[in-house]
């Protein structure tokens, strides 16, 4: 067997007949499989033990030799070698075909490789191969052209005239003769000459043929190997036959297909021996050809061969294709041992890095470890005894299990795993029951809830795997979201509500204005019921020992509330005392206004002071998130995770104490709701009257009515929010960010508003009732449209978004950080991304975490803010924007020169850790996940704006797909191809608008539809590639007009526009990585003196290499233009055939690769997963595995001190 980790590339090619025979261990002569009486394989049959090896370990067929001691003997009675039965998985056989047959992949694939090589049409080939026509192999004196087709009658006629003077053949034999006669060098020369002169269709045909001829010549494949003389038979264990309960047999379809081939082949041999008439032999040969076609790719030609119940049989090609094929089912996604799954329940008492494992599950998962430990501790005498103890679940087993699982992390995964946070590592603790306990804060990352979700557990076995799980995957380490670098573990729901309730202040709380000496005194008073959580009190400032308080502040009294004192207990000591939810208080110091000078107080003391000051807002979800981000910026990840745990415990404790519930009485109905409705009803009547008089059009009336009702809803919403009390439970829930929002509340208490019809158009009759009042039958019916649409949309969206992620991962999986610095001299100019006046992504967000490409000086003081190749930290980014600088050059993935990946400097910081990115990080996969994961949050619908604008703009998920697949967008914009001035805009025929642009040398006119809005006016000067009308630009066209850099920036902007409009933040670098993958190919226009083929797609690096070579030898370089490929196309065009074949169109990719003799250097992740090597990312990179240990010089150090264990 080959050692998987020891080979560096994989090559594929056509197999010669000799090669096939060399693989084989013997010829299969009979179609029999198993003897139904003895259940032994038949001799010379498809399962023959002599050919494929014994069915039982170390035992020959007849039973003469048994046991290992006869290893390697060949039995003299039955001829079976005594060896392991495992060889039946690897030994192949063969069939010697009585007549050559063509391989259907090469003859039938599109384009037909055989046809291109012979310069014959696939129709003609089919006629010859399936015995409908003769092909002239050697014309002799007949005057016929070689490769001419003759019908039966024509052949007879010529044969009578010129007996035995010319050769014409039928079937694959004729094609084989023609293929053997091809002189590849000669063909190449002729084709290259033809390229010089040919044009149009002949040129394209010549280029296609040149590609195939070149492939055969370079790969060393012989064209005649496309015709098979010998057929390989795959090992029997891979096409098994098993007995079912009823004595019947279940068998793989391949056996049926092989049986048909063998039967027909044997019949043909017999006919040839008997010297049967030509027509019978021909018919049999055709049937053999069809049988082999069905075996290789059933259903590719004609009707597929069916088994029982009219089910098409699965041929060899089907074994590879699709989700159930070999690639995706067994090579890329294997099931693993040491895994379990169960329902999840919440574990509020767990620490951030812990999870609860059910006892029984843990025992089963860690069984081998426990068995080993039981034997070592001499609790069990041997392994067998240990096993039975575990199965009986004896008492002593549990203590051992406790010890085994300490410090042994396990991985928890929830499907669908949309991004890297879908699998995280935890330290297990044993729990009773059968549910896995999950820490409440990691639910956001998993997108899990506790309504019956299930999760899977996996055990990392090796020490290295455990170390990686602990260092890289521990939940406490994964606090930031890789897509935008913001914390992903923020408190939610109950935790938010508890902290909100805790920091609430109330005017009428008991003992307001009491003054305390220190916090201990406050907590005692609270415990004894002297003050309430919401009581506003004073505490001597110096008792806090807070480093941010000034001396003056320390001499005063801090005015705060009991709840805030409790809240500040969990905040790190070096922080300011947090008294109000503001960034200033959080980042700098507690505002002066909260410090009261005791000497300045009036008669009423502190109570009077509180009566005259406003209440401070409680801390909501957003502010809690900001606190966590600030702690993360100042301290380590460990401190942050401890802080999160404290915040969680506090939240749960006080949301329990608050006892906040929702009842019908909490929904307050507006008294003047009816008045608002009547008022708007009158407005609608007015509009209808205007329409009836013919003053406005139907569209204008409709838009006005929709606007009136929207306004009514807004007005009701506004008044509702005003009328709510601050202590209303529903208001508290929505205000704190725990659950719900203003719109939900309006529907409960105000009115439901306008609904959309199934077409997406808004129904102009509003639902005026609220849920509190109850809906009428008609209103209920109208609202079902929206509900159903919502559910259908969600289901479709999930599938679409998953498929998008799969394509994105596929195209970017080989982008890995390969080096520290690529030394590029280019950069990307960045500034605000705006759409009209609307800000999409501000400049500061685009530069933070990136490396600068230029020196930036302060425009006034001229001091250097940052030099080239330095990291732009949040502080520096703020300095740059504060200095009034609006654009700068940064290092970007777009301009990176690294082959097969990016370099550290062009990528910037790793958003998941906040540190600089390290060599070996699989940034392509992270980028794909970051773009794909929020896909489910995007909307599906194309907005029907209706009315005046009239154009449907695609948004949401369909727009993202449109961009990444580089399709022509809906609602296309017209762009100018020349620089100049807009000379005139006039009406053309068919109600179109004609825009005339006058340049320096030429004038161009562009047609736009009558309804599209123009973005230019007469006399305006326009740049090349500027848009003349509103809409989306067609990217492929834009590439040829405006060039590479403009197209990259445009695609980046478009992707950001879609996500930001839906409120999803994704960092630029992820989009850059993806867009760069779409633009890595060029199409050769002229080959010059290089070996490149005109019209072919070539990797940009290979193109520059070829030209560098040409310049070196003073030859003519090639010219090419950049090509924009959609992600599906780009994945299939990748250098690695394994990756492409496992993605889509498996047979086409493999056919192509075999002819070219392609070599896969295993650079990406997917290729290595397929063959079972470690992936070349992280610690699996070659630079880490090629280390030599020098044993002789390594110093040996003895450690004698006791090692302390740190708690």
Curated annotation (Swiss-Prot):
Reactions catalysed according to its record: RNA(n) + a ribonucleoside 5'-triphosphate = RNA(n+1) + diphosphate
Keywords: DNA-directed RNA polymerase, Magnesium, Metal-binding, Nucleotidyltransferase, Transcription, Transferase, Zinc
Co-factor requirement: Mg(2+); Zn(2+)
Pfam families per record: RNA_pol_Rpb1_1, RNA_pol_Rpb1_2, RNA_pol_Rpb1_3, RNA_pol_Rpb1_4, RNA_pol_Rpb1_5
Alphabetized SUPFAM superfamilies for the sequence: beta and beta-prime subunits of DNA dependent RNA-polymerase
GO cellular component: DNA-directed RNA polymerase complex
Record text on cofactor binding: Binds 1 Mg(2+) ion per subunit.
Binding annotation for Mg(2+): 449, 451, 453
Enzyme class: transferase
Residues noted as binding Zn(2+) 2 in the record, renumbered to the chain: 822, 896, 903, 906
GO biological process, one term: DNA-templated transcription
EC number per UniProt: 2.7.7.6
InterPro entries: DNA-dir_RpoC_beta_prime, DNA-dir_RpoC_beta_prime_bact, RNA_pol_asu, RNA_pol_N, RNA_pol_Rpb1_1, RNA_pol_Rpb1_3, RNA_pol_Rpb1_3_sf, RNA_pol_Rpb1_4
Entry binding sites for Zn(2+) 1: 60, 62, 75, 78
HAMAP family: RNApol_bact_RpoC (MF_01322)
Biological role stated in the UniProt entry: DNA-dependent RNA polymerase catalyzes the transcription of DNA into RNA using the four ribonucleoside triphosphates as substrates.
Family named by the database record: Belongs to the RNA polymerase beta' chain family.
Assembly description: The RNAP catalytic core consists of 2 alpha, 1 beta, 1 beta' and 1 omega subunit. When a sigma factor is associated with the core the holoenzyme is formed, which can initiate transcription.
Protein name listed in UniProt: DNA-directed RNA polymerase subunit beta'
Gene from which the chain derives: rpoC
């Amino acid at each position: 067997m080959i050692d998987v980790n020891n080979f560096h590339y994989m090559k594929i090619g056509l197999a010669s007949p000799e090669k096939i025979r060399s693989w084989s261990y013997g010829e299969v002569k009979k179609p029999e499989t198993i003897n139904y009486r003895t259940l032994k394989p038949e001799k010379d049959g498809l399962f023959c033990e002599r050919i494929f090896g014994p069915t039982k370990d170390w035992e020959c067929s007849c039973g003469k030799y048994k046991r290992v001691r006869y290893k390697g003997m060949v039995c003299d009675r039955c001829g079976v070698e005594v060896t392991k039965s495992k060889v039946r998985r690897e030994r192949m056989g063969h069939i010697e075909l009585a007549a050559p047959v063509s391989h259907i992949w090469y003859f039938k694939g599109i384009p037909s490789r055989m046809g291109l090589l012979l310069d014959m049409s696939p129709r003609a080939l089919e006629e010859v191969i399936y015995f409908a026509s003769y092909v002239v192999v050697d014309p002799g004196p007949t005057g016929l052209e070689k490769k001419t087709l003759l019908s039966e009658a024509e052949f007879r006629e010529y044969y009578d005239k010129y007996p035995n003077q010319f050769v014409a053949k039928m079937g694959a034999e004729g094609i084989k003769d023609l293929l053997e006669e091809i002189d590849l060098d000669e063909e190449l020369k002729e084709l290259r000459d033809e390229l010089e002169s040919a044009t149009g269709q002949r040129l394209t045909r010549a280029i296609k043929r040149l590609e195939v001829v070149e492939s055969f010549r370079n790969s060393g494949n012989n064209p005649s190997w496309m015709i098979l003389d010998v057929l390989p038979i795959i090992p029997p264990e891979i096409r098994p036959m098993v007995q079912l309960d009823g004595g019947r047999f279940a068998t793989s379809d391949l056996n049926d297909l092989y049986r048909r081939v063998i039967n027909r082949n044997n019949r043909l041999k017999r006919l040839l021996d008997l010297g049967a008439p030509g027509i019978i032999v021909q018919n049999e040969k055709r049937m053999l050809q069809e049988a082999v076609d069905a075996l290789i790719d059933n259903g590719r030609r004609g009707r597929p061969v069916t088994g029982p119940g009219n089910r098409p049989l699965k041929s060899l090609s089907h074994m590879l294709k699709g989700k159930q094929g070999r690639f995706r089912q067994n090579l890329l996604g294997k099931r693993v041992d040491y895994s379990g799954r169960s329902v999840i329940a919440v574990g509020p008492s767990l620490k951030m890095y812990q999870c609860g494992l059910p006892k029984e599950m843990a025992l089963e998962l860690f069984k081998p470890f426990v068995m080993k430990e039981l034997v070592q501790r001499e609790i069990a005498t041997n392994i067998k005894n240990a096993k039975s103890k575990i199965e009986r679940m004896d008492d002593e087993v549990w203590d051992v299990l406790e010890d085994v699982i300490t410090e042994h992390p396990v991985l928890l995964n929830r499907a669908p795993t949309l991004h890297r946070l879908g699998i995280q590592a935890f330290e297990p603790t044993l729990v009773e029951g059968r549910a896995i306990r999950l820490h409440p804060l990691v639910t956001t990352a998993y997108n899990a809830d506790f309504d019956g979700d299930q999760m899977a557990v996996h055990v990392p076995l090796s020490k290295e795997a455990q170390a990686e799980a602990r260092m890289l995957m521990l939940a406490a380490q994964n606090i930031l979201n890789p897509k935008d670098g913001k914390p992903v573990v923020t408190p939610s729901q109950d935790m938010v509500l508890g902290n909100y309730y805790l920091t609430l202040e109330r005017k009428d709380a008991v003992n307001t204005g009491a003054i305390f000496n220190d916090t201990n005194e406050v907590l005692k008073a609270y415990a004894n019921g002297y003050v309430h959580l919401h009581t506003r009190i004073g505490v001597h400032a110096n008792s806090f020992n807070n480093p941010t308080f000034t001396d003056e502040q320390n001499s005063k009294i801090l005015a705060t509330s009991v709840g805030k004192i409790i809240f500040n207990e969990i905040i790190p000591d070096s922080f300011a005392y947090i008294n109000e939810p503001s960034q200033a208080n959080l980042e700098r110091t507690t505002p002066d206004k909260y410090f009261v000078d005791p000497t300045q107080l009036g008669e009423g003391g502190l109570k009077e002071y509180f009566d005259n000051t406003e209440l401070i807002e409680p801390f909501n979800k957003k502010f809690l998130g900001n606190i966590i981000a600030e702690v993360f910026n100042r301290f380590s990840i460990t401190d942050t995770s401890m802080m999160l745990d404290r915040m969680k415990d506090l939240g749960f404790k006080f949301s329990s104490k608050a006892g906040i519930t929702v009842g019908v009485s909490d929904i307050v109905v507006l008294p003047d709701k009816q008045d608002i409705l009547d008022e708007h009803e009158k407005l609608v009547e007015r509009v209808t009257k205007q329409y009836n008089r013919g003053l406005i059009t139907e569209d204008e009336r409709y838009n006005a009515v929709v606007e009136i009702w929207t306004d009514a809803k807004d007005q009701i919403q506004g008044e509702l929010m005003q009328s709510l009390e601050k202590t209303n439970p529903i208001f508290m829930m929505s205000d704190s960010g725990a659950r719900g929002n203003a719109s939900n509340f309006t529907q409960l208490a105000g009115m439901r508003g306008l609904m959309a019809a199934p077409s997406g158009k808004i129904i102009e009759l509003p639902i005026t009732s609220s849920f509190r009042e109850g809906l009428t039958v008609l209103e209920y019916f109208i609202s079902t449209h929206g509900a159903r649409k919502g559910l259908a949309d969600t289901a479709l969206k999930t599938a679409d978004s998953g498929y998008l992620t799969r394509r994105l991962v596929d195209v970017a999986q080989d982008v890995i950080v390969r080096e520290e610095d690529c030394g590029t001299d280019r950069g990307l100019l960045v500034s605000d991304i705006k759409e009209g006046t609307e800000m999409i992504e501000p400049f500061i967000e685009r530069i933070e975490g990136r490396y600068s490409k230029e020196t930036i000086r302060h425009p006034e003081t001229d001091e250097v803010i940052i030099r080239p190749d330095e990291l732009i930290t949040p502080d520096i980014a703020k300095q740059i924007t504060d200095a009034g600088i609006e654009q700068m050059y940064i290092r970007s993935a777009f301009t990176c020169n690294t082959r097969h990946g990016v370099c550290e400097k062009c990528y910037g910081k790793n958003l998941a850790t906040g540190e600089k990115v390290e060599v070996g990080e699989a940034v392509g996969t992270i980028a794909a996940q970051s773009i794909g994961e929020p896909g489910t949050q995007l909307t599906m619908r194309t907005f029907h704006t209706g009315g005046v604008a009239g154009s449907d703009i695609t948004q949401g998920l369909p727009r993202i797909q449109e961009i990444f697949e580089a399709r022509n967008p809906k609602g296309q914009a017209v762009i100018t191809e020349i620089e100049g001035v807009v000379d005139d805009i006039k009406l053309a025929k068919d109600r179109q608008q004609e825009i005339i642009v006058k340049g320096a040398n030429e004038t161009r006119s562009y047609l736009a539809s009558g309804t599209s809005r123009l973005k230019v006016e007469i006399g305006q000067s326009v740049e090349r590639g500027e848009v003349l009308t509103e809409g989306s630009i067609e990217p492929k066209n834009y590439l040829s007009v405006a060039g590479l850099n403009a197209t990259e920036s445009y695609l980046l902007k478009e992707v950001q526009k879609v996500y930001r409009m839906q409120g999803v933040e994704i960092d630029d670098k992820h989009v850059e990585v993806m867009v760069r993958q779409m633009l890595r190919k060029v199409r050769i226009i002229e080959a010059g003196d290089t070996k490149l083929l005109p019209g072919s797609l070539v990797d940009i690096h290979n193109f520059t290499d070829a030209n560098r070579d040409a310049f070196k030898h003073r030859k003519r370089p090639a010219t090419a233009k950049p090509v924009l490929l959609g992600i599906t196309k780009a994945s299939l065009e990748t250098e690695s055939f394994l990756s492409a074949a496992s993605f889509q169109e498996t047979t086409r990719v493999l056919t192509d690769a075999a002819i070219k003799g392609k070599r896969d250097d295993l650079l990406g992740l997917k290729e290595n997963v397929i063959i079972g090597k470690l992936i070349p990312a992280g610690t699996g990179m070659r630079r880490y595995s090629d280390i030599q240990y020098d044993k002789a010089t390594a110093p040996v150090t003895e450690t004698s001190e006791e090692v302390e264990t740190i708690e």
